[in-house]
Regions:
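CBM-like carbohydrate-recognition segments
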Residues: 1, 7, 11, 15-18, ...
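Structural helix-adjacent loops and short alpha-helical linkers that scaffold large soluble proteins
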Residues: 1-6, 46-60, 112-131, 137, ...
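Aromatic-lined substrate-binding rim segments of carbohydrate-active enzymes
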Residues: 2-6, 294-339
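Active-site lining segments of carbohydrate-active enzymes
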Residues: 27, 41-53, 61, 65-69, ...
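Boundary/entry segment of secreted carbohydrate-active catalytic domains
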Residues: 247-303, 308
């Protein structure tokens, strides 16, 4: 694999970007947007591992060339390939495939995780990532999903979970990495994650995954594919990272920070995976713990969850749904934990 990569880097193609099925010469460049997930992270990782700029330079040259060819600067979305230039959906909008753009955005998240902060080339990918995330967030449907066609969901009303999974993954990564504003993007992430968990049936199968293709198509509840599951797991990893402090065995979830600024006692919720002592709570100076605070079990999820609360009474038998004193916080908890 490395030998082949070396050959590609040392013999860059000057071929066309016009993908033609059956003509392997047109696969020498990144001529379809899916390739922006497949190839760039490999070269970014090789650069990181070897510190050899030739991998970075090759990736950067090819990525920018693909961007100039496939990116629509009016819609801030990527065409799947040149065959869709000029095509329209039933509503007259341009054809932008949900999973195609999800491949691109997830690929950008992968690239950014390999490029060191302060690297001159990184700024280009950060700017594109933020630009695309902002556009994608605005295209989420009320049900929390993105659909097969980004600009004509009415023609493809079924959920589509492979695109939704990769979008949630990228958006959650962006918040975790400090690239995206938490207040703006957390509602989108929570809604998307809740939608994904709703798409898992009683047997554990993820449904609503569009089969292998190149453009928007109809999707049914029974359709599944390994890349859809991969997108779901990638999203779950970032959601977990968002919730878990790796230096302590507890989960932090907090509501809108503007609310916290007005009343710091209304904001912090801490879950522990066991019925811990007061010393556990007191060692975190950002959590106010009154002497008469209570610790109550609120869930029988995989991790045994407890909450330390001092601003309300809480009936543990009612679970999260019985907590009526902070509606916004309840929604945040539900979005993070519900299946």
């Amino acid at each position: 694999t490395l030998a082949r990569t070396e050959w590609i880097v040392n013999h860059p193609s000057n071929g066309t970007f016009k993908l033609e099925y059956g003509d392997n010469k047109t696969l020498e460049r990144w001529t379809w947007c899916d390739a922006l997930f497949m190839a760039p992270p490999v070269y970014a990782k090789l650069y990181r591992e070897t510190n050899n700029r030739k991998y970075l330079q090759f990736m950067d040259n090819e990525y920018r060339a693909t961007y100039e060819y496939l990116f629509d600067k009016e819609e801030n979305l990527f065409y799947r390939d040149w065959h869709y230039f000029g095509k329209k959906e039933a509503n007259g909008k341009k054809v932008f495939w949900g999973r195609g753009n999800a491949w691109v955005l997830a690929g950008l998240a992968e690239v950014l995780q390999e490029l060191p902060k302060g690297l001159m080339e990184r700024a280009y990918y950060e700017e594109l990532f933020i630009r695309l995330c902002t556009r994608i967030a605005g295209l989420q449907n009320e049900d929390g999903y993105w659909h097969a066609s980004l600009l004509d969901p009415a023609s493809y009303p079924s959920p589509e979970t492979s695109s939704t999974g990769f979008f949630v993954y990228a958006l959650a990564y962006g918040v975790n990495a400090g690239l995206l504003n938490e207040d703006d993007f957390m509602p989108v992430i929570i809604k998307g994650w809740k939608a994904l968990t709703d798409a898992v049936d009683a047997s554990g199968k993820l449904g609503w995954v569009q089969p292998i293709g190149a453009d928007p198509r109809k999707v049914t509840r029974d359709m599944t594919e390994v890349y859809g599951v991969g997108a779901f797991l990638a999203a779950g990893c970032q959601i977990y990272k968002m919730a878990v402090d790796t230096e302590a065995d507890y989960i932090k979830i907090w509501p809108d920070r503007k609310t916290m600024q007005g009343n710091p006692l209304s904001g912090w919720v801490v879950y522990a995976n066991e019925n811990v002592s007061d010393d556990f709570w007191k060692k975190y100076d950002h959590i106010y713990v009154p002497e008469k605070g209570t610790t109550v079990k609120i869930s029988d999820y995989a991790r045994t969850l407890y909450i330390r609360t001092h601003w309300s009474t809480f009936n543990p038998a009612e679970g999260v749904y019985g907590w009526d004193t902070n509606e916004k916080l309840k929604k945040v908890i539900q979005g993070a934990l519900d299946r």
